[in-house]
Amino acid sequence: MAPIIHKNLTAPELVEWALKLEKDSQLTARGALSVRSYAKTGRSPRDKRIVNTTDVTDNVDWGSVNMKLTEESFEKLKTIAKDYFATCKHLFVMDCFAGHDERYRLKVRVYTTRPYHALFMRNMLIVPTLEELQSFGEPDYVIYNAGEAKADPTVPGVTSTTSVALNFKTREQVILGTEYAGEMKKGILTVMFELMPRMGHLCMHASANVGKSGDVTVFFGLSGTGKTTLSADPRRNLIGDDEHVWTDRGVFNIEGGCYAKAIGLNPETEKDIYEAVRFGAVAENCTLDRRTHEIDFNDESICKNTRVAYPLMHIDGALSKAVAGHPKNIIFLTNDAFGVMPPVARLTSAQAMFWFVMGYTANVPGVEAGSARVARPIFSSCFGGPFLVRHATHYGQQLAEKMEKHNSRVWLLNTGYAGGRADRGAKRMPLRVTRAIIDAIHDGTLDQADYEVYPGWAFTFLRGLRTCPQAC
């Protein structure tokens, strides 16, 4: 018997179905949908594959990040997904857009058996109007999320029961063996990292906001380094928290929502994000109080990588059409696990390209499956290594050209550890200190400050501010 197909349901309808079909789904005290992704609570980069076809083989930087898969193997994985769908009672389909700039917008169709996944992508992408749905037609990309079904390790190129495979030729993604919702959104980011350079535009793993005078700031950083938190500034308008493109006209957000790390979320210092976790939002792998259903944001009993996903409209002042001008300030967020980086440094154009391509930072615990329990130093090119398709220097050259053309200022901001190493009990840079530094960047104070060369690093930093201020 064919499954009942639920197409383009509203958020309340998807919440209702999740509560009916998913045994561990429940409402939080503020109405968000609390869900579990079970065995996989982070991305599975070792199981990511890109199909090696003639149209992309020369563009892709093949290696440990972009591992090859044949077209035949991809078709076998897609068959597993479709066969699984055929055994299910319900199938949820969402038609959405990726990209607020309509010149580069992609039509995306998602197939999934879990209402939570459908609601997640409804939040993370851009929901069409009724008129747009009527003329939606065939999608540009299709995601087959059969995460409850296992991949077949005997398929050539598949090495476990988990597979996240992307085919640029057929414009499809197949997900097997993982129910972690983040695989879908990062799949779309990977697509844009391939498509946008073809048009001369820079795809960025970055957040962005804009001031009242139209000044745009872009924050580059790996997951957990502060992109979502720091871009949600009550004095500025949010453009987006994770995925953007820099075109000839300015910056646009690929997504229609935010996917924030929830562990340690503080309603006093991160009020905008806290208040966004309400009805329509998804709370992924969070622990609830049994009686009150309040989220315990400090509970790591399920995982360290607890997440909340909510639409942009849940943030006061977020741009409904998330398109803005060229960046005045670019901030590289580095999670320094050694505690040796200054709180802030100013970079020249040459230094900016070097640090961008090098991407020194640290893996935040839990973001990837099997990651360490403490922050470990890594080099993630372009502050988005897991999602790059082409060689990092290609994106680095694009950034350098755009920075020079639009006279963008570049800053290196340490959101990592101060006064010691992460593995020896040091604490992360206080959020209030980081916010104060960003405020000083925005109001021009740091541009007029007295700088000196940081010994051994060559970049310039605020005189007398080699370590975290006494306010720490």
From Swiss-Prot:
UniProt-listed SUPFAM superfamilies: PEP carboxykinase N-terminal domain (SSF68923), PEP carboxykinase-like (SSF53795)
Pathway involvement of the protein, from the record: Carbohydrate biosynthesis; gluconeogenesis
Molecular function terms from GO: ATP binding; phosphoenolpyruvate carboxykinase (ATP) activity
Domain of life: Eukaryota
Top EC class for this record: lyase
EC number(s) reported in the record: 4.1.1.49
Keywords recorded for this protein, A-Z: ATP-binding, Decarboxylase, Gluconeogenesis, Glycosome, Lyase, Nucleotide-binding, Peroxisome
Chief location: other
Gene Ontology cellular component list: cytosol; glycosome
Cysteines engaged in disulfide bonds, as pairs: none
Alphabetical list of InterPro entries matching this protein: PEP_carboxykinase_ATP (IPR001272), PEP_carboxykinase_C (IPR013035), PEP_carboxykinase_N (IPR008210), PEPCK_ATP_CS (IPR015994)
Pfam families: PEPCK_ATP
Subcellular location: Glycosome
Catalytic activity: oxaloacetate + ATP = phosphoenolpyruvate + ADP + CO2
Transmembrane segments: none
Keyword hit for ATP-binding: yes
Statement: the UniProt record of this protein carries the keyword Nucleotide-binding: yes
GO terms, biological process: gluconeogenesis
Binding residue positions for ATP: 221-228
PANTHER family named among the record's database cross-references: PHOSPHOENOLPYRUVATE CARBOXYKINASE (ATP), PHOSPHOENOLPYRUVATE CARBOXYKINASE ATP
Subunit structure: Homodimer.
Function summary: P60 has the capability to bind to microtubules and membrane vesicles in vitro.
Family (UniProt): Belongs to the phosphoenolpyruvate carboxykinase (ATP) family.
Stated name of the protein: Phosphoenolpyruvate carboxykinase (ATP), glycosomal
Source organism phylogeny: Eukaryota, Discoba, Euglenozoa, Kinetoplastea, Metakinetoplastina
